[in-house]
């Protein structure tokens, strides 16, 4: 060891070199991925290439909960409200997640409407071409049906609309930081103040 260099202290496994992922032929890998996508589209025809439909959910934590994204699957309550049996749903391209819970009415109604829209657009091919069962689409619809190559029913993030108002003297005097601090203090001392008020009322009655 010489000079003022960092002492090597690598925490590697004995055979770490076997697990190094390399990419020496990137153009060929790109071609391979494209061919794999095409083969998959042929294999799953006439289903959409994007996979099953997913619900609209809000992201977790305080930082991201204002953003909406695709979730894992629809809840059993959402399927019931849309009139879709839970065992039928995965067979017609609807993702189901029995762990997820509906915590808001708006989210519940949005996903129910999403399911109803999907159901109205859905074209169901018969398992056997010669035997048509109840629920299968008409021959005219089957003839005109094409495979959806793009993301079907994409989630659109609505931009909030802002209204311009005239600035008043009360608005200029209002201090948002002080207001937040005051409300926090009031919340923190609510229990103690209620207890003191109850004790004072008791003393007055005596």
UniProtKB/Swiss-Prot annotation:
It holds the Pfam family Ribosomal_L13e. One of its GO terms (molecular function) is structural constituent of ribosome. InterPro entries: Ribosomal_eL13, Ribosomal_eL13_CS. The keyword Ribosomal protein applies. The keyword Ribonucleoprotein applies. GO terms for biological process: translation. Keywords: Ribonucleoprotein, Ribosomal protein. Gene3D superfamilies: 1.20.5.110. One of its GO terms (cellular component) is cytosolic large ribosomal subunit. Belongs to the eukaryotic ribosomal protein eL13 family. HAMAP family: Ribosomal_eL13. This is Large ribosomal subunit protein eL13y. The gene is RPL13C.
């Amino acid at each position: 060891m010489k000079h003022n260099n960092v002492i090597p202290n690598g925490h590697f496994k004995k055979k770490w070199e076997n697990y190094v992922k390399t990419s020496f032929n990137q153009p060929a890998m790109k071609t391979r991925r494209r061919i794999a996508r095409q083969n998959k589209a042929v294999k799953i025809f006439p289903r959409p290439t994007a996979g099953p439909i997913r619900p609209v959910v809000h992201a977790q934590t305080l930082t991201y909960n204002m953003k909406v994204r695709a979730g894992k699957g629809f809840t059993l309550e959402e399927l019931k409200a849309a009139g879709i049996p839970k065992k039928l749903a995965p067979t017609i391209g609807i993702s189901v997640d029995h762990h997820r819970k509906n915590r808001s009415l708006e989210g519940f109604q949005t996903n129910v409407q999403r399911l109803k829209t999907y159901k109205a657009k859905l074209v169901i091919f018969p398992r056997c071409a010669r035997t048509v069962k109840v629920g299968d689409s008409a021959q005219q619809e089957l003839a005109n049906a094409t495979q959806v190559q793009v993301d079907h029913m994409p989630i659109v993030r609505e931009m909030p609309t802002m209204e311009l108002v005239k600035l008043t003297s009360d608005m200029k005097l209002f201090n948002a930081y002080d207001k937040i601090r005051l409300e926090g203090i009031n919340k923190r001392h609510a229990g103690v103040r209620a207890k003191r008020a109850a004790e004072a009322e008791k003393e007055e009655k005596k």
